[in-house]
């Protein structure tokens, strides 16, 4: 058995810029998509990472009546740690949290994702940030209504 075959795997739910597989592969070159998943009770939002007005991005926003969508990736635990480091988890900019997703068969799937732990705002992301979100969303079979919701979230940011 090779070293890579023995490496521990993790799963990561991408709902923002990392929906774009090229963006995901930049940080996690071994990441493999497992499919579209949904997360009930949340929507995607944008926020500043604490008090720094220069740093902001996607975050989870509790929304009891909403279901959001994204892509679940399988990746080595080492690459998930690398993603955390690149995201500034150690500085408190983002936090890795455990969530429970639902697949297209209705089965519950545990996963990790990133969110901003102490969101501040407002944050208006530049097009260089939102374009990969939309490109990624359109590359997967996400519900058309959800893509419209993303467009509206971006427009209102």
Language-model-detected regions and their locations in the chain:
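Glycine-aromatic micro-motifs
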Residues: 2-157
